């Protein structure tokens, strides 16, 4: 007999699941052993023994507290039969673990059922990160508006409450959401993620809500884009978000081939009719950093009024208005996206205002918008200072946190970091400036080794010169995989400089492109 059926999910809701002891037995089996708190040098056998004790004693007490709506997860009284220091500290953590995993299992069952929905208006396509650059290079020149921002995860109370509005649209169980909100209010710090090179491991429940929030963020944008184009019925809802969502009109037209026989007519209608009315809206996202490029049509002001302003107010958490001075200062600035700088240059006559009954739409005529081929050296130095590899002026310093590794691991960390940076920015026009980054990483590695062995830099240099000198990465390109190409031959002016094929960015490089 199944524990839960889909009919009971829809009829009774998910709140009664917390009163089933069999459900917590299932949760206990699926719990990750890495989340179990280990105090001191306790043997694993004792830990498993206490785990069984908690299963038989605390589950019934937990269900009883949930029934009384008096669930306090850190104020649990001791049991007289097992009054030990280890057990007292462990059972407080056990309440948190069992509740978090219970919610995680229930929410996973909900979203597994939601994946089978047929009317999900979203196109979510998995692409390599480098496919964004040639796309932007072709599309961004003709676009009028460029919206660049980051998705903020639960930094304010309003955004935290907005998460429960999203959950209520999917679940419709007030008692279940009320219990979830009380638990997350106590553990709100788990839902905030910081992007550094050394990422701390979040609990599985917080990662679930993070992916949920990004999923709803993408679905909101795509829903209004497709609603504006009147192409919602042609979408393929089976696609799922992985790491990089990439949306454009051609991807929508590819789905027409599977369901429509008269493809040329539909493509002509999409290219002529819909483009002339609403223009094109292109959207690229990498993790929490996103960019929207809008090409105007006849009714682009209607889209801006009913969709984009609502999107900015609800999702980004700040008010948006069509102020001339605000938009002029905003679009006159250059900004970084995926580690490259997008340059904006305006004409002298850059605004054309037309009076309309509801508002005064502003039409921008921008010139010279392009992706700069120059590597942002000062931004890279700033990222290295965040990683404590140099100061703000670019002077190398030692990394004390990495001194606990052995010598080979330390040299491999610095070598891989430099190799990834060389590979990512190998097509830049000022790639000779990579010598500054090489100098910082090379001497930071030397100082880290000298700090570990408590010796001078001169003696450390003479000892590890053959192994730490990263100059061979640039000279001997034939020994380093994909950096073995002749850069002068490949990156001529007649060729595109987007010749990278990174399918996934390493953790060591993610710090540079995500902390814009």
From Swiss-Prot:
InterPro entries: Domain_X (IPR024937), Maturase_MatK (IPR002866), Maturase_MatK_N (IPR024942). One of its GO terms (biological process) is tRNA processing. One of its GO terms (molecular function) is RNA binding. Keywords: Chloroplast, mRNA processing, Plastid, RNA-binding, tRNA processing. Its main location: plastid. One of its GO terms (cellular component) is chloroplast. It comes from the Eukaryota. The keyword Thylakoid does not apply. Disulfide bonds: none annotated. It is found in: Plastid, Chloroplast. Belongs to the intron maturase 2 family. MatK subfamily. Usually encoded in the trnK tRNA gene intron. Probably assists in splicing its own and other chloroplast group II introns. This is Maturase K. It comes from Chara vulgaris.
